[in-house]
Design a protein with these regions (language model features):
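Thiamine diphosphate
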Residues: 170, 177-228
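Generic recognition of stable, solvent-exposed alpha-helical segments in well-folded globular domains
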Residues: 23, 33, 59, 162, ...
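Cofactor-binding active-site loop characterized by glycine-rich and histidine/acidic residues
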Residues: 36-39, 46-170, 188-205
Length: 228
């Protein structure tokens, strides 16, 4: 049963200090305010097309950006906060949502395809889970720290598990983050499969934990992954 205290560690935030907390709040809050403005302008009709907001997950991205230094980034369709937290310029993101040529995908990718050469962020095509094997391939080629984020339904795609196995076999410097909201559109996990993502990862001898989306927990375990 998932809960707000899943995997919690007492007093963990104190181990990171005030500067980490301030940077975390600054990045997460900036993303939240940006997203609220996007929502407001979409409702008023200034933004056309689907909008994939990061509201509610901004501090996940903020924590990852503080724990990982200049990785290759392969996010999912909700990539606004990931882009902003890792230092992406908000103006090209704004312009992308407005469909302008000055957008980060030249105004043709839209909300789900956020990319930036400046922060090594690769856009998502919309194909469920495709970012995982792409991230593994890029990491294998460049041997550079890599981050990929995907949802709980994406891990069920048949090309994701082999990508995890390839990463383990080749000891690649890659961090996999599965953002699990227990839903694939409107279908609960228990109606889709009988196994847990963390068990799949552990079966491959990966360092893997099932935790709540607490930013200090995320940073703590990402540091553990890097150490291992």
């Amino acid at each position: 049963m998932r809960s707000p205290t899943l995997g919690a560690i007492d007093g963990l935030s104190e181990q990171f200090g005030n500067k980490f907390a301030l940077d975390l709040f600054t990045r997460g809050n900036f993303s939240r305010q940006f997203e609220l403005k996007v929502k407001e302008n979409a409702i008023e009709g200034y933004i056309n097309g689907p909008i994939y907001l990061s509201i509610g997950t901004e501090f996940n991205s903020a924590a990852l950006s503080l724990a990982l230094d200049n990785p290759l980034i392969f996010g999912q369709h909700r990539g606004h906060s990931l882009y902003l937290s890792f230092g992406g310029d908000p103006e090209p993101l704004r312009d992308e949502l407005l469909g302008l040529n000055s957008g980060c995908s030249y105004g043709v990718g839209g909300s789900c395809c956020i990319q930036s050469n400046e922060i090594n962020m690769f856009g998502h095509s919309g194909l469920l889970g495709e970012q995982v094997p792409l991230a593994v391939g890029a990491c294998f080629a460049k041997k550079q720290l890599t981050l990929t984020i995907f949802g709980d339904a994406a891990i069920e795609e048949d090309y994701v598990a082999p990508a995890l196995g390839w990463a383990v076999t080749n000891n690649l410097p890659i961090v996999f983050i599965c953002e699990d909201n227990d839903l694939s559109v409107l279908t609960k996990t228990e109606d889709r499969r009988s196994w847990r993502a963390v068990d799949l990862a552990n079966s491959l001898n990966m360092y893997a934990v099932d935790i709540t989306d607490d930013p200090w927990l995320i940073a703590y375990h990402v540091n553990k992954i890097r150490e291992s």
